[in-house]
């Protein structure tokens, strides 16, 4: 059991580092919006209820994610506290997010094994819709062929309420 906790902690730290490393480039010259550095309360909430990957489906019990087919994606743009609350299936204390200034993107994708890590995410507004770019990196080593759910989230400067698509890249 200690191994699972250590693995969970390591994955959570990696996700937090990736999210925070993007904080210096909230709006890049390339037209992309990058996640902002989230307050520790927000990081703690997602470390607890939406770890980067897990096999116990705790996140599916707390968040309203549908069952996905292999290599499918589910994602939500959250622009209000009510929308955030509506995503949850149980009553848990929500972190304080100023939805007048920020938008939250929460999602889930399913990959063929646990050997991936989210390296970068960014949103690009393209006319009447937005595209969320997710870049996963293949880790070195051997991983069992076990379909694995990967969860992601990002806090952004306020985004328009437009349809959102996901572009998943694996490097």
Cite the ranges covered by each PLM segment.
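Sec-dependent bacterial lipoprotein signal peptides
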Residues: 1-20
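A short amphipathic beta-strand at an alpha->beta junction
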Residues: 156-171
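An anionic, turn-rich surface loop/hairpin at beta-sheet edges
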Residues: 135-153
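Bacterial Sec-dependent N-terminal signal peptides
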Residues: 19-49, 171
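A short, surface-exposed interaction/processing loop segment used at functional sites
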Residues: 38-39, 147, 151-153, 158-159
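Mature extracytoplasmic domains of secretory-pathway proteins
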Residues: 69-131
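Post-signal-peptide N-terminal segment of Sec-exported extracytoplasmic proteins
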Residues: 46-85
């Amino acid at each position: 059991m200690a191994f699972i906790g250590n693995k969970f902690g390591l994955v959570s730290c990696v996700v937090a580092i990736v999210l925070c490393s993007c904080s210096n480039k909230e709006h890049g010259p390339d037209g992309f919006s990058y996640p902002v550095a989230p307050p520790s309360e927000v990081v703690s909430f997602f470390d607890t209820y939406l770890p980067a990957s897990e096999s116990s489906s705790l996140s599916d019990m707390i968040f309203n994610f549908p069952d996905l087919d292999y290599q499918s994606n589910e994602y939500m743009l959250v622009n209000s506290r009510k929308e955030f609350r509506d995503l949850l299936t149980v009553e848990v204390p929500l972190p304080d997010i100023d939805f007048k200034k920020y938008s939250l993107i929460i999602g889930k994708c399913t990959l063929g094994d646990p050997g991936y890590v989210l390296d970068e995410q960014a949103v690009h507004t393209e006319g009447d819709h937005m595209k969320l770019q997710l870049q996963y990196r293949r880790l070195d080593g051997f991983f069992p062929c076990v379909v694995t759910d990967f969860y992601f989230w990002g806090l952004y400067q306020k985004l328009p309420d437009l349809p959102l698509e996901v572009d998943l890249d694996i490097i």
